Amino acid sequence: MDLKELYSLRNNFTIIGLTGRTGSGCSKIAEILSNDYHSFEKEGLRDVNEFNNIIFKRKYSICKKYLENGDNWVKFVVIKYVDVLLFFILNKYGGDYAKIKELLLDNYKESRSESNHRIVSSVMKEIKAIDYEYTETINEIKSFDHFKDIKDESELRRLDAVFFGENYYNLKKKLFEVLNNGGYFRTRLLLHWTSCNIRSTGDPLLTEKPNIKNIYTIANLINRLIKAKRIVNGSKPTKIVIDSIRNSLELMFFKERYSAFYMLATKDIIGNTRERIDGRLCETLTDSSERERIVLKVLDLDATEYRTKDFSKGIFSSPDLENCIQKSDYHIFNLKKDDLPEFIRKYCNNDANGFYTREEQLLKLLSLIQLPGIITPNSIERAMQIANTAKLNSGCVSRKVGAVITEKYVNICQ
């Protein structure tokens, strides 16, 4: 019997959900996963001969040889949360200028008190021009009734063709370009409040009469897109990466539905967050002081989404990044190959033996997903497994905490 058959389910279908603080690298991880193996290897994998620890060298070599062999590497299809959000808005209000203007007046502002009539009028002119250019695509999006009820194979194929098609790609690109030109932080807040409204009321505009039944509205649409992609791919492997999930109930939605779902949290390890956000603003803002002001506002919003107390008040529609990160299955730090020497010197006592770059960490994760047990866990991972078991068995209702005490060689103290 061919051993490939034993792992065929893992090889043929995988969903990775991404989460992390703003600027931590979720979009970059999604981009890396969507590339071919050659790009993946070139960008962040070190040569095996750069390691001097025989055991680690063997583990690294096994993972590398496995993924580069045959068709073990399959490019992931990226489902961007913001693209799904825009798709939902267009389905609801596409072509309805009065509703779109109302949505922008309510949410496209840097603060609730800001008067944004002038900038909304300017943005609406450009939106109308885009709407005229892509009327047919918008009408196709509006032709879908209730996304949750799309189960017919022909309708799922049509959903896949529209969402992943070139026309919608160009449409969303132009719309976000217009919105970002009007203000990057305004766009962030528009997406923030609109997603909260949809999870609360099922409508981008409504804020009153929240209903917990609407909490999975966006997740249900993503779920339909996943099913559509599986049908279109047929017998070919389907690999999906969701960029990114910021509500822990949506996270649990996918965990409970798919055994092949893995939640991955990213972390900025060397303090490049500000620099990354500033880099996104350079194209539209030349004034450095204005960029700094926007960066601070974006980081403040990120802190709000991370430390939110809304869940304790029974408001489940808000983003709660802290819970998302805590409930993640796998944690990686966003470390480029160029930053490796500084990281090794600062954190690893000049020991270069380890899966350190983001590509190397993904190399290990994907190998283990597709072939569990391909390499054995290291001492830190074994200790963390015990700590996690202690956490799961914690008697504390409010905080599930687990820990293990080791000596310097990570041997567990008795």
Model regions: which residues?
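Glycine-rich phosphate-binding loop of ATP-dependent small-molecule kinases
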Residues: 1-243, 247-275, 281-395, 403-413
